[in-house]
Amino acid sequence: MHREDDSTSTGRREERLSTGKGDSLQPGPDQRIFQTALYRPQRHGLILFPQRLYGNCLAPLAYSNYVAPRELHSSIHAEGRTLSVRLIMLFVNTSKRSRTLPPVGSTVMRILVNLCQLLSAEFQLLQGSQRLIFKLCYRTCPDQRRGDTRVAQCPGDSHLSQCLTATFRNGVQRPDAPQQLFVLCTGLQGAALIRPRPFGDSVQIAGGQQSLSQRRKDNAAGSDLAKGIEQAIFDPAIEHVVIGLMNEKRNPLFLQDRGSLLRQFRRIAGNPHIKRLALTVQMRERSHRLFQRRGGVHTVRIEDVDIVEPHPLQRPGRGWRSGICDLPPMPPYGPGHMSQPAFEEMIISSR
């Protein structure tokens, strides 16, 4: 009897929720109704009913074993503004113990609902939530290619790319080629901007600056006006009038010294008198290393090949199998038969 009363009261609450005639759930002029229904006849069915949004108030409402709607309505809080759709979930226990509960009505909000299908839900922005659409769980790092240049970054993070930061042995990195030409033409040292370093600020960089790539860069100072005097001894000798030519061939300075174009316009002030080592033939010397060489691959021609005593298996013919098959059958050997010298002579003559 108590169960029937409970089921009857629950059915009334469900009807009041579905038809919108309840006192505490009457929609106002600014209230929007989201219509969604779902029913799966399983052991623990799930039914989703529409929820009324009171202004900017959002709160998930869940019915477990037919909880009174008035109690759940009291749990609505007006805290936060997010973009989402809140559904009233009704868990129906279809086991043997609760089969006496009333069935779910075939209409929700006076609209015929197919209990075996999931209807479409409406997603709309709430009023006053234009500034905050999604709540950021964490600030994205610049290494994930989706960060913001104005977001505060860690000192070890690079600038908007997945890459390895330069080592900490030098605080600055050489500027780009246009900046070096600017320093060379104007005669100003240290006026060029530097790339974002671990000790620098990623925001205060030039617009044309490139971020650190995915390989570790050389972070030596880019002003080669004073550095080039020390590295002059490793450049081509002074007898080469044209810089970048060696043995009448173009030396790949752009591949070896691509980090600085200032070396292309620099002349040698003196001959270091360093003799190269003649270790191998046709070896080239790099412009920035003294003993770094490269070996070439050449064709080899074979002449006057003499074969001395080839192996029996390497004789010309159909193969080693043919040599065995062409042998005559072995005669009987032993007392009363062919002697050993005659047998060996016959074998040799057959070959």
UniProtKB/Swiss-Prot annotation:
Keyword Chaperone in annotation: no
Top-rank taxon, per record: Bacteria
Ranges of Basic and acidic residues composition bias in the record: 1-18
Assigned keywords, A-Z: Herbicide resistance
GO biological process per UniProt: response to herbicide
Region spans: Disordered: 1-29
Role this protein plays: Confers an increase in glyphosate resistance when expressed in E.coli.
Further details from the record: PG2982 is able to utilize glyphosate and other phosphonate compounds as a sole phosphorus source; it can grow in over 100 mM glyphosate.
Name assigned to this protein: Increased glyphosate resistance protein
